[in-house]
Regions:
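Short, surface-exposed ligand- or partner-binding patches at beta-edge/loop junctions that are enriched
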Residues: 74-75
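Rhodanese-like catalytic fold shared by cysteine-dependent sulfurtransferases
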Residues: 1-19, 27-71, 80-150
Length: 150
């Protein structure tokens, strides 16, 4: 799997305006703040009483909205969910996907020491407002079927 740092992801997006930042965090995580130009298709949904559960529509919504030959950088909170999403997308035939190491928040070791700074830690461009076409609800509707997204 190809991996890039948040800075490398930002540089790719700057050089290639067609490069897509796919944020696979839950809807509330995305709405709290995300990379500029990111779109949100959660790998997992968050439910207050149940925690995280798989998004059964992840593959369907990805395939309906992202051409397989697109250049896509995939991020999450720290890099774990996005690595899984990259694996899934590669199996589906996506040819140019890269996992964003450290994700949006950054990755720390067991002692709390930062081992990979995230997008927000590096002060890369971010926002909490969403364009309608970047939100999961809109992306899921384009497929003609929408499941509840918490």
């Amino acid at each position: 799997m190809k991996e890039v740092t948040p800075q490398q992801a930002y540089d790719l997006m700057t050089r290639d305006p067609k490069c897509i930042y796919l944020d696979v965090r839950s809807v509330p995580e995305f709405e709290a703040g995300h990379a500029v130009r990111a779109i949100n298709i959660p790998l997992m949904h968050f439910s207050p009483g149940q925690g995280m559960s798989p998004n059964d529509d992840f593959v369907r919504v990805v395939e309906a909205n992202l051409p397989k030959d697109s250049r896509i950088v995939v991020g999450c909170k720290t890099g774990g969910r996005s690595a899984r999403a990259c694996d899934i997308m590669s199996q589906l035939g996506y040819t140019d996907v890269a996992n964003v190491l450290g994700g949006f928040v950054g990755q720390s070791d067991n002692t709390g020491q930062v081992v990979q700074p995230g997008w927000s830690m590096l002060n890369l461009p971010q926002c909490s407002k969403c364009d309608d076409d970047a939100q999961y609800e809109s992306l899921a509707k384009t497929t003609g079927k929408l499941r509840a997204a918490e």
